[in-house]
């Protein structure tokens, strides 16, 4: 097919021409799709086999090639286990328009033994790191765009009907809003309650209903549609019977996910005495814009509505709030609230916005930070494995944020006797100089606290990275010399 039949591909071609001057002026900028030196493992090209969905957000040159603007994107592809891709969905939203290329598209991929690899299709290049055969982290590595996200395998047997049952969701509309809530889906009709946060305002607790019920998903790619009574309309993308992604189909940048709610009824005792929970979140601020806040921490509950300990790190608008002690606080989780609760942490030497959360199950929740200065949302989960003494196994990670440019990273770290080895693919996107894809192999050191807070130095990358472990080699991170953060997950044994 003619690649110029795709509006998005027109941007690729025009941007390639516009970037030639930048390439000549930027010596040693790296090359798109650079490979990461392998750390070891048993992954192969056959590890990526089946149908997958990617949800990602980023920033890139717009269709008119007049400015660089945020975007949201959802991609569905099939990998044959032998380096070939077939892309059946590429929904791309930027500047108030949903852009869909002529489909299907073909492409290629490669997976190294350590799970790092690349995807290439429709003029775009991506670096990925496998968590296991069904999940991977991903960034876009192009001169005209950078992005980060997550990919997971679809269960195509779940494409027979719209999702059904009780679900908890979270969604983010870049620079605009966050929302979390609980819904019931019956025969495609949606009813429920959400907490909706608009930038500059405190959140509102609202009823949520569908104006147009969820359609049955496409039998080939798992995509369906629905419209809410507030006028927002979405494509949704089935992962399995208990999870789906969704993204605006009317030009906003809103993108989110929903998971089946299990483990109820919930109460204050659900967050049991002496249980610790690790959280990670990110968002946009009224002062600095996109990806200008990243937060992570751990807090301990008493099962009766009180917070009895913890620590928090966050960076907001380039202001670092490091290793703040949780000296107290309160939480609510009413027995008749459908899993909705609140958290107020009291910090020594600082403060943090209250959280409104919805329990996905008995150990994990989605939340938003209720603040007029930012739209921030994230996840918290029950911590296991404490007290911690060391990092012990290879883990995949993904990061995004901003320092002097927009940054996205994906890769691996592997503990050693003296610290760890760290391999990353990255993209640094300056709105005036465009992208700078690179690959880096380095080493680092760390100091771990028993509560799972880890102070990390990555040589040549940062001396101010902080991990919070929700389990061994899994958790969230904040880079404290920049507005950058992310998540990491222990790789499955191969």
Model regions: which residues?
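Bacterial N-terminal signal peptides that target proteins for export
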Residues: 2-17
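C-terminal motif of bacterial Sec signal peptides marking the signal peptidase cleavage site
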Residues: 24-28
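Mature soluble binding/inhibitory domains
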Residues: 29-494
């Amino acid at each position: 097919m003619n690649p110029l039949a795709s509006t998005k591909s027109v941007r690729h071609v025009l941007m390639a021409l516009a970037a030639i001057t930048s390439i000549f002026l930027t010596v040693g900028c790296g090359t798109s799709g650079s490979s990461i030196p392998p750390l070891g493992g048993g992954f192969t090209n056959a590890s990526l086999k089946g149908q997958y969905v990617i949800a990602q957000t980023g920033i890139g040159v717009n269709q008119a090639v007049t400015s660089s603007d945020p975007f949201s994107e959802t991609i569905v592809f099939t990998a044959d286990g032998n380096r070939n891709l077939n892309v059946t969905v590429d929904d791309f939203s930027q500047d108030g328009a949903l852009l869909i290329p002529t489909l299907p598209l073909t492409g290629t991929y490669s997976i190294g033994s350590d799970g790092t690899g690349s995807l290439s299709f429709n003029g775009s290049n991506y670096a990925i790191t496998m968590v296991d055969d069904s999940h991977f982290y991903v960034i876009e590595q192009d001169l005209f765009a950078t992005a980060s996200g997550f990919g997971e395998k679809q269960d195509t047997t779940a494409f027979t009907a719209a999702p059904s049952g009780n679900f908890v969701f979270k969604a983010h509309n870049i620079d605009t809003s966050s929302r979390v809530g609980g819904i019931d889906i019956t025969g495609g009709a949606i009813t429920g309650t959400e907490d909706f946060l608009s930038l500059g305002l405190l959140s509102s607790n609202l009823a949520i209903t569908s104006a147009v019920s969820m359609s049955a998903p496409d039998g080939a790619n798992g995509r369906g549609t629905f419209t809410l009574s507030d006028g927002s309309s979405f494509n949704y993308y089935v992962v399995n019977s208990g999870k789906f992604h969704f993204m605006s189909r009317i030009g906003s940048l809103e993108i989110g996910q929903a998971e089946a709610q299990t483990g109820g009824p919930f109460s204050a005792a659900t967050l049991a005495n002496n249980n610790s929970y690790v959280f990670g979140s990110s968002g946009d601020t009224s002062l600095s814009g996109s990806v200008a806040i990243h937060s992570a921490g751990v807090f301990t509950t008493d099962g009766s509505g009180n917070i009895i300990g913890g620590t928090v790190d966050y960076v907001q608008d380039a202001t670092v709030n490091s290793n703040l002690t949780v000296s107290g606080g309160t939480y609510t989780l009413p027995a008749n609230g459908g899993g909705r609760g609140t958290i107020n942490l009291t910090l020594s030497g600082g403060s943090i916005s209250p959280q409104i959360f919805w329990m996905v199950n008995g150990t994990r929740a989605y939340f938003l930070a209720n603040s007029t200065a930012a739209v921030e949302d994230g996840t918290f989960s029950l911590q296991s494995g404490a007290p911690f003494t060391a990092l012990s196994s290879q883990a995949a990670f993904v990061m995004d944020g901003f320092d002097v440019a927009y940054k996205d990273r994906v890769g691996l770290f592997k503990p050693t006797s003296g610290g760890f080895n760290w391999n990353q693919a990255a993209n640094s996107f300056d709105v005036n100089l465009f992208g700078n894809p690179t690959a880096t192999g380095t080493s680092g050191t760390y100091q771990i606290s028993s509560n799972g807070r880890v102070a990390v130095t990555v040589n040549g990358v940062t001396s101010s990275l902080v991990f919070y472990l929700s389990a061994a080699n899994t958790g969230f991170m904040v880079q404290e010399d920049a507005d950058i953060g992310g998540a990491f997950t222990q790789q499955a044994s191969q």
